[in-house]
Amino acid sequence: VVGDQVAVVGDVSGRKDTLARMVRIEPRRTLLLRSAEDGDSAGSQKPVVANADLLVVVTALADPPPRPRMIDRYLVAAYDAGMEPLLVLTKSDLADPTELLSLYQPLGVRCLATTITESGISGIEVVRQALAGKVSVLVGHSGVGKSTLINALVPAANRVTGHVNEVTGRGRHTSTNLQAVVNPDGGWVIDTPGVRSFGVAHVAADDVLRGFADLAQVAQECPRGCSHEPGVIDCALDQWADKADEASTRETRCGRVDSFRRLLTASLDAQDPTKA
């Protein structure tokens, strides 16, 4: 797994005709996992990166539009892995970041915004400082600007950048494999291929709520043993969503509850032996 620290014996000089072998994988501090949520392999886990400190969730504010439910998945995965999440909003010259910031800053998630300018990327220095000395993993769906950020942070990386399809609104996969590069400011920066989904069905149902700090607080008002599933009587999550005074607030809250319940259902289904 990328990020693993291993013990090696033999000739590690790298010279021709030398031989060395790995004898041990050291204990992992963190482990980012991704799981399948559909078909026969639902719930199966795949390790992505080991021993990383930061999960840098890169999200475009426009072109392509942001996907809050994808961000929610990454937050659940980050907390499950033992990593700190960092939300980096790109293309803030195309759309106002206020709405997304109002969703995630109150949850204690650090959020940074960047803008492409004629002289470079505005805001990149703050991102650089946040990543300095740490092992950071950049994730996000295609077209959000991960490779552009990598190239700004580590020019020697020379990652290929792409554009968003105007018809589908989706980015083209320019990164097809994980690449770890040394951060000039200390640590490592790991670029991951753009994805259109990130399964978290491997996360235990009780732990899914950790990715929704706002809902976790509300859930304390639920009756003992409440599963928080759709249709459960007296679930405080429904009451919280319904009692919002303004329609826009009600819509936002309903969206948060629905996002949580989708991930909760996937987790419960994956852990149900009768559905294997």
Regions found by a protein language model. Give the residues of each.
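Phosphate-binding glycine-rich loops and their immediate beta-loop-alpha structural context
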Residues: 44-54, 58-112
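Helix-rich effector regions associated with P-loop NTPase G domains
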Residues: 2, 10-13, 18, 24-48, ...
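Well-ordered alpha-helical segments embedded in enzymatic catalytic cores
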Residues: 70-73, 126, 259
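Canonical P-loop GTPase G-domain recognition
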Residues: 84, 91-144
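Conserved active-site beta-strand-loop modules that form the wall/rim of enzyme catalytic pockets
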Residues: 116, 135-143, 147-151, 179-180, ...
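Signal for well-folded cores of large energy- and translation-related assemblies
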Residues: 60, 75-79, 93, 100-105, ...
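A conserved segment at the C-terminal end of the G1
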Residues: 146-162
